[in-house]
C-alpha cells in the first residue's frame, strides 16, 4: 500500500489480539494469553474441569480437588516471540508452572514464590502455557515479560510500535472484536485490568487510546453493533478525556453491516424489520444501519465535543462493488448530512495467495508483485471506485478505503 500510494495518507488495521497471531503488541505476553481452560487432573480430560472461580478481573481464587487450570500464552511458535530469558511474575501463593509443548523447551533458571526465570526455546509447532495446580492464596497479576523487559513499566513492545511508523491512522476493528461482538453495555467490555485482553469482548478502549497517544496516530474505532446509548456516550467521554486532542477520531458503527456473514448484519435486518423500515430484510438492514450510525455519531459527539470542536470524522460505510446500496445508506433520512466520509473495502491482490499462485508467489520480486497489484486494482475497482467517489462527493463526503 505504501509503495502504491506513497503520497497519500495510509492507515493500518491491527490483527486481533490472540495467543496465535503474528503481532506481539505487549511486553507482557500474558496480556494476550488465551482464557483459562479448566482440566480434570485424573483421569485427565482436556477442558472438562469445573468452572474456574475468579475475581472480577479473571484471576483464579481457588481450585477444587483434582482440578487445575492453564492459559496458553502463545501457540504455534509465533515468530515474533523470541527465544531467550523470560521472567514470570505473579502475586499470591500457590503452584505456578511454565510449560513448553511441541518441539520447544524451557529451563528454569531461578524460582521463588512470585517469580520464575526461564530460558525458553519457543516451540514452532506447539504451545507455551502457564499452569496453576495449587492455590493457597489467590494467584493474581501474572506477567510474562519478554526477553529484556523484566518488571518493565512499558505496555507496548518497541518493535510493535516501530511497525506502525509508516502509517497515520490505526483502525481497531479487530482489537475491538467488532465482528459478531456480544457487547451491549459498557460493563460487558473487557475490563482494563482483566488478566487478558484476548477475549471475545475485545481490547479495552484505553489500550487503543494509549497506543494512539504513544505513536501519534489517528484512531479509527468501531462501535459494537448492539452497544447501547450509554456505551457510546462513555466511549465519547473516554476519548475526550484520554486521547490527545491533536489526534483525529474516525468513528464507525460496527463493521460491514451489509455483509450477511456477520451477526451485525443479521441484527440490523431484525431491527430494521421490527421498525418497519422496509419489507425486504436485507434492505431493512441497510436502512437500520444508516439511521443507527447517525444516532451513534450524535451520542458520541455529545460528550466528545462537549468542550469544543474536536477532530472527528463520522464514517458511513458500504460495499465497494455495489454503489447503489451505498446510495441507499447515505440517503436514508439524509444520513449523509450527519457524516463526514463514506468508506468501502476495495480489496485487490488477494488472488496471489490462492492455490494456483501460492507455489509461484515466493519467486515474485517486489516490483513485479506491486505491478500485478496495480493492474488488479485498476482492472477490478476503477469503475466502482469512481462511482463511489462521485456519489460521496455529490453528498459532500470524502471517500475512504478501510481495508
Functional labels for PLM-detected ranges:
Residues 1-253, 258-402:
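Non-catalytic accessory regions flanking glycosidase/transglycosidase catalytic cores in CAZymes
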